[in-house]
Amino acid sequence: EDNHSTVEDDAANYDFDLFVIGAGSGGVRAARFSANLGAKVGICELPFHPISSEVIGGVGGTCVIRGCVPKKILVYGASFGGELEDAKNYGWELNEKIDFNWKKLLQKKTDEIIRLNNIYKRLLSNAGVKLYEGEGKIVGPNEVQVTQLDGTKLSYSAKHILIATGSRAQRPNIPGQELAITSDEALSLEEFPKRVVILGGGYISVEFASIWRGMGADVNLCFRKELPLRGFDDEMRAAVARNLEGRGVNVHPRTTLTELVKTDGGVVARTDHGEEIEADVVLFATGRSPNTKRLNLEALGVELDRTGAVKVDEYSRTSVPSIWAIGDVTNRMNLTPVALMEGTCFAKTVFGGQNSKPDYSNIACAVFSIPPLAVVGLSEEQAIEQASGDILVFTSSFNPMKNTISGRQEKTIMKLVVDAETDKVLGASMCGPDAAEIMQGIAIALKFGATKAQFDSTVGIHPSAAEEFVTMREPSRRVPGAGKPKTNL
C-alpha cells in the first residue's frame, strides 16, 4: 500500500502538509525531518514548565524537561557521594566537613533544561517549522484546533496529522494519594528530602532511590514483586537490589502502600504489612499513561488500546489514514531514541518516498541506578522462552579493580546469552560502573549478528571492565529452550 505523499498534489487545499501535536523527542524529529524533505510543517506544544499537567509542558518534552536529562544530571550529582568515599584510600585527605547543596544542583539543572528548551525551539525554526504555543486537539481527519493560553482557538488544516503527545506519570488510587509526588516534582523539589518512601519497581523508582541515597537521604523502596525491574534479566535484577541494599537503601520487596497520612513531621506511609514509615516525601513511580484523553480521538474513530495508547500499524499509521502517531503515546517501546527512530521513519515514509518501518530488535537500554545496569537483546529468561534448542549462558562476576584499593565491596556482573547451535549472541547485560557506556558498543555487535566466536577473537582493552565481554571462555550453564522437543532417552 502506498503511504507516500507527493508534496505538490493537493497541498494547495491545506494550510500544512503535516501538523504535529506535541514537540517532544519524537514530534520535533518528525517535524524537522519532514520539513527537510520539503513538507510545510506546523507543530503545537503546551507552554513550558518543569512540572507537566494537561495544559503545561514545553518544547523538548519529557526527556529534556522532566525526564532523562535532568534525571541523569541528578545521577551524576549523587555519584560524587560514593566517589568521595572511595577517594580516601586513593590518598585524598578530605579533612573539612563535606556538605551537599541540593538547591545549587537544582538551579544548575533548571538552567540546563531552559537552555535545551531554547535549543529545541531553534532547531524547529531553523528547519522552517511553524511553532504554535497551545493545546492541540484533532477536530477532523485533516483539521487541528490549537487553544492558546488566553483561550483563543486557532484552526489549521493538514494533509497529515501526527500525534506525538507522549505520556505522563500516573498515581495509584490509594487514600492520601494527593500527598505523594511523581517524578515530575521529584526533579524540582524545593527542599532536599531527608527521608523518602518510593513506591514502584520500575527503572524510575530504582534511579531515584540511588539519587537520594547517594546524596545522603534515608530511602525506603517498596515494590510488589520479589525483585525490582520486571522484564530485565533476573540475575541482573538481583544484582541491582543487592547494590541498592549495599549502599544503604531499605528495600521492601512484596510490599505495597495502602494509605498516606499527613502528620506534623511529614507524611506517614502505611504498607500492606502494617508498617508505618514516616517520610518528608513519598514518590509514586508506578507507571505512565499516554496523553490521549483531551485529543478528541474516539470521536474521530482513532482506535486506542485499553491503556489509552494510540493503536498504530508498523508504519505508525492509526486507524484513520490521515492520522499517525509516534513515541510514548503509542506505548510501543517508551524510550527517547525509539521515538527519534519512529519520527525519522515516519518522515521517510510519508514525505521521503521510501516506506520505512522502525526496527525494534537489539535496542540497548540502561537503568541509571548507582551503579547502572545496561542490557541489549534478550535476557536469559526471554532467550529460554523463545529458543527451540539449547542456550549457553556465560557470566562473569568480579570486584572491579578500582574497588580493590577503595575497599568498596560491590561486584560487577556481566552476562552473554548465546544460541548453542548457531553460536549467535542473543543478549548481553551488565550491572556495574560504566555499564551504559560499554553496552552501546556491544549493541552494534549484536545488531550485526555477532557470534560468540567473534567476541572471543576480539582482543580486550587492559585493564578495563569491558574486556570481560571478550574473555568469557567457559559457559556457566547450558539450558534447554522452552520449545526444545523433549526426549525420554
Swiss-Prot record:
This is Glutathione reductase, chloroplastic. Belongs to the class-I pyridine nucleotide-disulfide oxidoreductase family. It comes from Spinacia oleracea (Spinach). Signal peptide: none annotated. GO terms for cellular component: chloroplast; cytoplasm; cytosol; mitochondrion. NADP(+) binds at G201, I204, E207, R224, R230, G287, A366. Catalyzes the reduction of glutathione disulfide (GSSG) to reduced glutathione (GSH). Maintains high levels of GSH in the chloroplast. Glutathione binds at S25, Y120.
